[in-house]
């Protein structure tokens, strides 16, 4: 950040986004980035493909990561991204918050299976794909309830008929610029949100 800041001047608009591990960082650290760029009054935070349920997030953050108290205090449940986004909304309710992910994310379901069972597998199954969809449905409901005004973009690109899994991450992928849900691509959805038009697409993919 110290090297980048002199190169960008004093922008009035800021988009913080990251995919996979970067998505978790986006949820946790957007307010830190904002503090480094105080000129940006128009801020959008977009989490891409970051969702893991785990009862030990607080202990992990405190004892393993040695995270600062400001982060640990946000972690009250089993969904670190939800906790972080709720805290971000409460402290900066003018920040536009977005979440995007695929319906049966291949990589995330592998890690979720490891958390749930203690067994690390490198192969998805129809069962683990279905379970991940249930977790995503729960996440969607919680985000819409606890983060008013959030924009969601759900998609199912990269479907693998062998195991029912779908693509992991969209922001760094070429199909970020292709409409996957509705008439908008993820890139267009993010651009619109940064301009103040926050919408949701692909919610029908999460219906029971």
Show which residues each predicted segment covers.
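C-terminal His-loop and adjacent cap/lid subdomain of alpha/beta-hydrolase
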Residues: 1-208
């Amino acid at each position: 950040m110290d090297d980048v800041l002199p190169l960008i001047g004093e922008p009035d608009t800021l988009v913080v986004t990251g995919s996979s591990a970067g998505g978790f960082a986006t949820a946790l650290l957007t307010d830190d980035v904002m503090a480094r760029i105080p000129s940006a009054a128009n801020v959008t935070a977009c989490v891409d493909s970051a969702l893991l349920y785990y009862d030990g997030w607080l202990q992990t953050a405190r004892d393993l990561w040695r995270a600062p108290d400001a982060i640990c205090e946000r972690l009250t449940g089993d969904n670190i991204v939800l906790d972080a986004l709720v805290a971000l909304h409460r402290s900066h309710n003018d920040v536009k918050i977005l979440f995007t992910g695929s319906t049966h994310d291949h990589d995330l379901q592998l890690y979720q299976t490891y958390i749930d069972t203690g067994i690390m597998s490198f192969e998805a199954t129809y069962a683990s794909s279905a379970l991940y969809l249930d977790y995503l449905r729960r996440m969607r409901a919680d985000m819409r309830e606890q983060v008013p005004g959030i924009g969601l973009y759900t998609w199912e690109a990269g479907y693998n008929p062998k195991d029912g899994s779908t693509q992991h991450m969209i922001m760094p992928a070429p199909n970020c610029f292709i409409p996957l849900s509705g008439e908008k691509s993820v890139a267009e959805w993010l651009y619109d949100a940064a301009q103040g038009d926050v919408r949701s697409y692909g919610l029908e993919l999460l219906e029971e």
